Amino acid sequence: MNAKTEKQIENLKNQTIGVEIEMNHITRERAAKLATDFFGTGRYEFTASRNGYSTWSAWDAQGREWKFQKDVSIAGCDAEKCELVTPILHYSDIETLQELVRKLRKAGAISHAGVGAGVHIHIGANGHTPQSLRNLANIMASHERLIADALKIDQCRMNRYCRTVNPRFIEQLNQKKPTTMAQFADIWYTANGANYGRNQHYNDSRYHMLNYHATFTKSTIEFRLFQFDKPTAEKKNGLHAGQLKSYIQLCLALSEMAKELKTASSKPQQTENPKFAMRTWLIRLGLVGEEFATARTFLTKNLDGDAAFRFGR
């Protein structure tokens, strides 16, 4: 591994993380109790008066609040519509999050597109500029189809909750080349037909794989496209800690690459060998070595083609 890649990996790990996992088949109170038992703090309580969304909260040993909230988009009875919202996390916290996910799975929690459940990942926007955000939008526009195929994203979710980058937004963004965040925000909201209630949580511009509404309201970049695999005979409830870590690593790498590039193109990638295209792209993103082996597996296993040879053996 060369020094440039080592620095790239170091930088991607220094970003902050937030994760939202939608699930059902577990009540919010039970999930909070399970979390506080896992954290060993014994502190959990009903916090809806402060947080809304019928929230139950659990606190870890660092005093951070982990929320379990009601999300009406999740299928099932209201009592078991449960969305885990993490506090601000760091790379070193991923293993803790993974272990909590394993405990939720063992307790019966279910998360996959079939029950209207997705995974949203927030990366702190610190260090980003209008140019780096433009780079990220172009990177996503050129790779969204590849990512969607790799993750087998549910089409209903893509039609409603995690749409691809709006072509009007990309066109205006690359024509106007904003130099301030205010200019960037104007393009984002007007191009997406959502130039109203910019401070409202449910502004319609948010329902994209790459959500910059979160950037202007929460100082994060939200990736809304993820979901756990549907259940199989071997894996019944969809939650998977390794898959979640892979998603987080991909988002961190995308954010870091956008910061490092001078410019990025929105031109779609080659499609004759998707598996090869994904593997080589992950290498450019810095997801190399044993640490990212699971991510490379999850992000290439569903794609057609030969990972080693673009035009076949």
Summary of predicted features, one role per range:
Residues M1-A113, N126-R313:
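C-terminal accessory/tail domains of diverse enzymes
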Residues V115-I123:
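Short, conserved phosphate-binding/catalytic loop or strand-edge motifs used
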